[in-house]
Amino acid sequence: MAEEMRQELSALAAIFCGPHEWEMLSCSETDGAVFRIHTTAEGLAGEDVPLELAFHLPAGYPSCLPGISVNSERLTRAQCVTVKEKLLGEARRLLSEPMVHELVLWTQQNLRHILSQTETESSNGTCTLPESSTVDGGLWMTLLRLDHMRARTKYVKVVEKWASELRLTGRLMFMGKMILILLQGDRSNIKEYLILQKTSKVDVDSSGKKCKEKMISVLSETKVQTEHKRFLAFEVKEYSTLEELQKEFETAGLQELFSECVLGLVK
């Protein structure tokens, strides 16, 4: 991890030092840092709106954009997505310099305006495309591996909900003990999915207590190529044999992905 990122994390921990303001979730040399900041901003009626801002600073940060997730019990999912898109736009302006504190301040200062703008567009029946739709040059794809699902029914519903809200398509695939998630969509939305996956209590531990997903692996992340099939929906599928799973990948034009990332998991 770069010294610049270490210094920024240290400064953020000192700035957001109030009760429950700062929460470091993971930090490593290879994957960077994932953390949450709990703050408030002024809403439409002048009220304090609680905000949960989750950030993933990848190893290449600040030369590349952070992953950002926005959640609030007072905002709709659509409003949270809009705030995230605006934040990513601001992040692009600040690229190559430490930016997290600036982004938090910007959110606090601009939330009311963003919500007002969203409300106006909604009442006028207009629909604007997300700013991030062309940031990374089209559709991206990532393949994830989960170690286990103890609370499978609940876990599956949460994954389906996230995929729907973030406009991601693909597959949640079960074969024996193997669990894979293949996602296609806008890269910033895939990044937000990963933040949600790592920061939300989606499963239970051996004692039945709710817990966060700590055993998730990113097997591949790449742009969708012309030979790859575009998934039209997100589906949950179960396979009895390795051949069935392989056929799913081959049908989608992902033979190479299967050979490089999946085959070795069952040997």
Swiss-Prot record:
GO terms for cellular component: cytoplasm; nucleus. It is found in: Nucleus; Cytoplasm. One of its GO terms (biological process) is positive regulation of hypoxia-inducible factor-1alpha signaling pathway. CDD domains: RWD_RWDD3, RWDD3_C. Residues 13-15, 100-102 are annotated as: Interaction with UBE2I/UBC9. Keywords: Cytoplasm, Nucleus. Residues 7-114 form the RWD domain. It holds the Pfam family RWD. SMART domains: RWD. Signal peptide: none annotated. Enhancer of SUMO conjugation. Via its interaction with UBE2I/UBC9, increases SUMO conjugation to proteins by promoting the binding of E1 and E2 enzymes, thioester linkage between SUMO and UBE2I/UBC9 and transfer of SUMO to specific target proteins which include HIF1A, PIAS, NFKBIA, NR3C1 and TOP1. Positively regulates the NF-kappa-B signaling pathway by enhancing the sumoylation of NF-kappa-B inhibitor alpha (NFKBIA), promoting its stabilization which consequently leads to an increased inhibition of NF-kappa-B transcriptional activity. The RWD domain is required for the sumoylation enhancement activity. Interacts with UBE2I/UBC9, NFKBIA, HIF1A and NCOA2. This is RWD domain-containing protein 3. It comes from Rattus norvegicus.
